[in-house]
């Protein structure tokens, strides 16, 4: 049985207070988990110079004490492998660093991504935007206004995607302002929010935010970013229940990560945990080839084999679509599972 860390974090603590009390030092993180730093772990600490370590205590509380290979820990702990310069890996794997206006990416025909905030509650070591120039694409009302003018001038945009960073790092009053502006643009029908905050700090789903979503004329979708069943807890389930009650469509996308979820049984457990929380598995992405994350790479052939096995373990509606994102392409690219044809 896993031994879970106790951090004395009040279940009802304000999300901003939790956000201000994240762990940023690898030594403190290992100490909380009662893990002795060996030579390899010590060598990895310098990787925070490449990309800062940042982990909420509520997320640490779901990690197993004494286990340096805990799948949640592996997603956030600095590693010496981040210094490896691997062929084909770059600082801009999706060719995103040239936005049409500051903070707005018009990547797809009918959809645009608004980078609402540059920061995240948790820094995931595999993040494809770990090198993104957020300083040039700051989330503030001035840049948002320019982006909204662009959206209003492009009637083909019927869906806006709030991304980041993490868009739910914006405070409720900021999200209220953005929603109000989007609701005034008649051709915008849907708002899709991609966020990891509801899983790492479930208290982010405030009653005020839920009520604002309930009032909106827009169809609102929340795409959670969850990679392992151990991330899902009761607090997350309660947050999702509140959102379901007001009609928010709940989806999840994962990244296939070596040493975290690279087997069918683990993915089946994740699909079951998500479905129990009212969240539909949506996409399983192969790793974006971002510099510093090559040690998480799972090959396409391995990914196909894992997915073929997953199909035998869960119902079809609980199987996410295996896909990769290719810079410059007009949509995500599904990976053919190479199933036998009758």
From Swiss-Prot:
Keywords: 4Fe-4S, Iron, Iron-sulfur, Isomerase, Metal-binding, Pyridoxal phosphate, S-adenosyl-L-methionine. Its EC number is 5.4.3.-. Disruption phenotype: Cells lacking this gene are highly attenuated for virulence in mouse models of infection. Salmonella epmA and epmB mutants share extensive phenotypic pleiotropy, including an increased ability to respire under nutrient-limiting conditions, hypersusceptibility to a variety of diverse growth inhibitors, and altered expression of multiple proteins, including several encoded on the SPI-1 pathogenicity island. It is an enzyme of class 5 (isomerase). PROSITE patterns: RADICAL_SAM. This is L-lysine 2,3-aminomutase. It catalyses: L-lysine = D-beta-lysine. With EpmA is involved in the beta-lysylation step of the post-translational modification of translation elongation factor P (EF-P) on 'Lys-34'. EpmB appears to act before EpmA. Displays lysine 2,3-aminomutase activity, producing (R)-beta-lysine from (S)-alpha-lysine (L-lysine). PANTHER family: L-LYSINE 2,3-AMINOMUTASE (PTHR30538:SF1), LYSINE 2,3-AMINOMUTASE-RELATED (PTHR30538). It comes from the Bacteria. Disulfide bonds: none annotated. Signal peptide: none annotated. Its cofactor is [4Fe-4S] cluster; pyridoxal 5'-phosphate. [4Fe-4S] cluster binds at residues 120, 124, 127. It comes from Salmonella typhimurium (strain LT2 / SGSC1412 / ATCC 700720). Binds 1 [4Fe-4S] cluster. The cluster is coordinated with 3 cysteines and an exchangeable S-adenosyl-L-methionine. One of its GO terms (molecular function) is 4 iron, 4 sulfur cluster binding. InterPro entries: Aldolase_TIM (IPR013785), EpmB (IPR022462), Lys_aminomutase/Glu_NH3_mut (IPR003739), rSAM (IPR007197). Residues 106-329 form the Radical SAM core domain. The lineage of its organism: Bacteria, Pseudomonadati, Pseudomonadota, Gammaproteobacteria, Enterobacterales. Gene3D superfamilies: Aldolase class I. The modification N6-(pyridoxal phosphate)lysine is found at residue 332. Belongs to the radical SAM superfamily. KamA family. The keyword Signal does not apply.
